[in-house]
């Protein structure tokens, strides 16, 4: 039984503002999205694990919850999945259907403002991914004391 589930087939399809408006005006949003999927821009061209996940709250908090060493948008999604795996909690993936990303205005935290912040986030991902279960357990325990 998975402690975390990515509820889509790891494909993310981005809709433009016009496509989003048309979808939201349709009688059946899901049918509209599925009918027009081929016209939506595929994100990254590789499997994604971000944007949406379901998790056992108790297990997730035991695993540290959100890693606040990340700023902005980016590798925190992959870190979250890898951390769960290192700590021995299975992550499931639904293999039926993409994630549809509706257009929306972007806020300040939706991008990196400088290379140093982007680099710091990538280094945090690498740091976590290189840990074994004991190192990661100790590291997560230290997060509770950092405030």
Regions found by a protein language model. Give the residues of each.
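C-terminal catalytic/acceptor-binding lobe
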Residues: 42, 47-48, 57-58, 62, ...
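Conserved catalytic core of nucleotide-sugar-dependent glycosyltransferases
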Residues: 1-69
């Amino acid at each position: 039984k998975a402690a975390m589930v990515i509820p889509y087939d790891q494909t993310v399809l981005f809709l433009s503002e016009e496509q989003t408006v048309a979808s939201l005006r349709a009688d059946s949003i899901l049918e509209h999205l599925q009918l027009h999927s081929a016209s939506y821009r595929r994100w990254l061209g590789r499997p994604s694990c971000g944007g949406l996940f379901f998790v056992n709250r108790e297990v997730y908090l035991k695993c540290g919850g959100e890693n606040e060493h990340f700023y902005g948008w980016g590798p925190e999604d992959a870190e979250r999945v890898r951390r769960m795996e290192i700590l021995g909690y299975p992550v499931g993936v639904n293999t039926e259907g993409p994630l549809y990303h509706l257009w929306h205005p972007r806020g300040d935290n939706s991008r990196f403002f400088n290379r140093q912040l982007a680099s710091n986030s990538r280094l945090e991902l690498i740091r976590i991914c290189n840990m074994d279960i004991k190192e990661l357990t100790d590291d997560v325990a230290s997060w509770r004391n950092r405030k």
